[in-house]
């Protein structure tokens, strides 16, 4: 048991999916996993373990933002020895050729969070996905006939930011904005683990197109299937 996760050590698999929304964790467990049991309800941040195609998999909500996901992934790696962590979340597109409901594989993540500068004493550390996970996810997407987007995302500290520089980020090739990937990749590197963010575009910052809260909670199955298939091939 850790501070924020009330599970016994053996109750969490070494491969885990990480949605921000705990209700999406519940949806994934009920829809995709066999024999799923809930191992965590601390602070309402639900966690489940079950099997997918015979492979033991866990799914844990992380909450929103760098501080929240940092707590959960640190405890998962430090207290439960989780080896493979795949974020399944949403993002806002900032490129014209990226459409709502497209699936993005985050190869790298830049950020305006001070987390890494504090960690590295002012150095601009560049967090990246694990190549094996990225390659596997891309190949699975192609097998499924998906038009996956692969590239850089931006991890924002503020959801409502009056000074956001989305146009500049877009000029530099950033595909979308979200709030957790930089922390996930940095901490996975620290602990020597594998990490990847598989993201569904829930809204388009340039056009204003968006999905509903219900859609964000209970759909986006293509992203989830890619993540699960990637996890069990490790």
Swiss-Prot record:
The enzyme's E.C. designation: 2.4.2.1
Source organism superkingdom: Bacteria
MF annotations from Gene Ontology: purine-nucleoside phosphorylase activity
SUPFAM superfamilies in alphabetical order: Purine and uridine phosphorylases
Signal peptide: none
Cellular compartments per GO CC: cytosol
Chain residues that bind phosphate: 20, 24, 43, 87-90
One example of a Gene Ontology biological process annotation: purine nucleoside catabolic process
Residues annotated as catalytic: 203 (proton donor)
Keyword Glycosyltransferase (UniProt): yes
Keyword annotations from UniProtKB, A to Z: Glycosyltransferase, Transferase
Binding site residues for a purine D-ribonucleoside: 4, 162, 178-180, 202-203
Enzyme class: transferase
The reaction(s) this protein catalyses: a purine D-ribonucleoside + phosphate = a purine nucleobase + alpha-D-ribose 1-phosphate; a purine 2'-deoxy-D-ribonucleoside + phosphate = a purine nucleobase + 2-deoxy-alpha-D-ribose 1-phosphate
Family matches, as Gene3D superfamilies: Nucleoside phosphorylase domain (3.40.50.1580)
Site (Important for catalytic activity): 216
Family: Belongs to the PNP/UDP phosphorylase family.
Family annotation (NCBIfam families): deoD (TIGR00107), PRK05819.1 (NF004489)
Protein function: Catalyzes the reversible phosphorolytic breakdown of the N-glycosidic bond in the beta-(deoxy)ribonucleoside molecules, with the formation of the corresponding free purine bases and pentose-1-phosphate.
Subunit structure of this chain's protein: Homohexamer; trimer of homodimers.
UniProt-recorded name of the protein: Purine nucleoside phosphorylase DeoD-type
Organism of derivation: Anoxybacillus flavithermus (strain DSM 21510 / WK1)
Lineage: Bacteria, Bacillati, Bacillota, Bacilli, Bacillales
Gene name of the record: deoD
